[in-house]
Structures are given as C-alpha cells and as structure tokens.
Amino acid sequence: MKQSYANMRNFWLDIKNLENRKGIIEIGPDRIAVAGIEMALADGTVTKHLFLATNSLGDSSLYFENNSKSGLGGTIGGHGNEALQTAAAHMLAHASKLTACMQCEPAGTMLPAPSNPGWVRLFAVSNEKLFHAEFEETQLRDPQHPFYPFFAYSQQTLGFFRTQGAHTSSAQS
C-alpha cells in the first residue's frame, strides 16, 4: 500500500478528525459517524486499493492507488451532488444496522486491508469502536446477502463519483 493512499485512508478512519466539526450525527445503536468500503483490485501482478468513505456531515471521499508520481488518485464529493449524498447517507444508515455482524476493535486500531484482489472490507467507525467485515465481492453482489444494501449503496456512490469526474473532465475540455 502506497504511503499517500495510507495517509488518506487513515485520516478517514481516525474519528478524532471529526471532533471539532459541528453537526456530526451519531447513527444507530453503536453511534457510528463514518462508514465505507475498501476494495483490493489486481493490476497485473500488483494489488491496488480503492477506498470510499462518508461521514454523517455528508462529506464523502474516494481514493485509489494508481501509477502517478504520488501513487494516489481520488476525489472529494457530496456537497452539491444530491444523488451522491443520498446514496452515501443510505450506505451510512445500512452500516449502522450491521455493526453487530462485524468484527469490533477499539477506535484507532489499524483496519486491515482486504485480503486479496476481489475482496471487499466494509467498515463503520464510532468514537469508541471500529467495526469491519470482509467478503468476496461476488458474495456481496447477491441480493440475499445481509451486507448487500451496504455494498449496493457503496457502488451507487462510486458511480456518482465517476459521473462527477466525467462531468468535471468534459467541462475542462
């Protein structure tokens, strides 16, 4: 994992970064304020990662490892994009309902990256705890899987980021 990617990932996983922000809402029985996914993807013989996170303020970010000098690509979104904000809010809401089905660690614990390409780690963060679960992406695409809504909303959010990026690229052309 490239350091620039790890830095952005760790920023989102450290709930202390939200301490001085007004309007944070803690959701569900475990009072989460951040949720997201991390995917491992094969790029030839190298594994690269994609990280999507949102918080209860409506902020969302997408980061991914790439071949640039910094090794990091990404975009920040949510504000001004109602569809993205709605999908991200649904992802956060579904994550809050699944914390009892996830592994639980003390807040500040290092979140393990997905085990292998094709695997997805879903996570939720509260002031006291880091919740996470890992599944093969093919499992999460099954509508009967308990984490399907969480994953499906993450994929919608990713799609809105892609659309946002495409609009930005065409506007700059």
Residue ranges of model-derived segments:
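Short amphipathic beta-strand/extended segments with alternating polar/hydrophobic composition
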Residues: 49-53, 71-80, 130-144
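A glycine-rich, hydrophobic loop/mini-helix early in the fold
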Residues: 31-37, 43-68
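Charged/polar positions within long, soluble alpha-helices
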Residues: 96, 100-103, 129, 134
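Short, well-ordered, aromatic-rich surface patches in folded extracellular/luminal domains
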Residues: 1-39, 114-173
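A short, surface-exposed interaction/processing loop segment used at functional sites
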Residues: 58-79, 155-169
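Long, charged/polar, surface-exposed segments that mediate recognition or autoinhibition
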Residues: 67-101
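Surface-exposed patches in mature extracellular/periplasmic domains of secreted proteins
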Residues: 102-112
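Surface-exposed, interaction-prone regions used to assemble/regulate multi-protein complexes
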Residues: 95-98, 109, 122-124
